[in-house]
Amino acid sequence: MEINTKLLISVTCISFFTFQLLFYFVSYWFSAKVSPGFNSLSFKKKIEWNSRVVSTCHSLVVGIFGLYIFLFDEATKADPLWGGPSLANVNIAIASGYLISDLSIIILYWKVIGDKFFIMHHCASLYAYYLVLKNGVLAYIGNFRLLAELSSPFVNQRWFFEALKYPKFSKAIVINGILMTVVFFIVRIASMLPHYGFMYSVYGTEPYIRLGVLIQLSWVISCVVLDVMNVMWMIKISKGCIKVISHIRQEKAKNSLQNGKLD
């Protein structure tokens, strides 16, 4: 077994146990310290709360690390299809450990946080990352896809606000909702164009052919599955954002009428 393979397996295992520790111990202690409302939540709410705390931690780690790699790791950018061992592989190993950890938690607490779409998302991602790490290919693409995680903290924060019963149209929720919509669109929807554009640009080239049919199909299918879910979530998020903006406009119009200043 090569040292690089041992390193990636070690990173995946450390990632798994770290996120398990965060879920079962650290999140309970930390959440009770920073949010007094946490202790008043039901058992089911606490389970999902802890799951989302872990999700946020993972997203910040792999998202920021992934952005650094995308911008500055020349080894990864030099050969997007067949680039050798790089920081991108480490980032993918961290993400893999998290996905395995989260899958185990979802299955264990299925009646509380079970969601078939998350199972599909995690399985599709894990399969793709397994091929990347096993075959040493497409690390650049895998890392690029991880940039989508930068939207998760905003999605989770929205849930935290709701769990703590913040007013639906409070300033904090409105600002977070707008940021969530914008960031989600940039990293999960707008990013599709350069991704599939790159896929088209390398189609039929010698490096692409060397990938083999299995990896070629897996690359396309796993990305399409994930992107279909991203589009579905984007539609749902957009509807919520439009509803909030419409409410704000109605409130402004109402206030203008009350003040005798109809614009």
Curated annotation (Swiss-Prot):
Similarity remark: Belongs to the TLCD4 family.
Sequence ranges assigned to domain TLC in this UniProt record: 44-246
InterPro entries: TLC-dom, TLCD
Residues found modified as N6-acetyllysine: K165
UniProt topology in membrane: Multi-pass membrane protein
UniProt name for this protein: TLC domain-containing protein 4
Any Pfam family: TRAM_LAG1_CLN8
Keyword Cytoplasm found: no
Gene that this polypeptide is encoded by: TLCD4
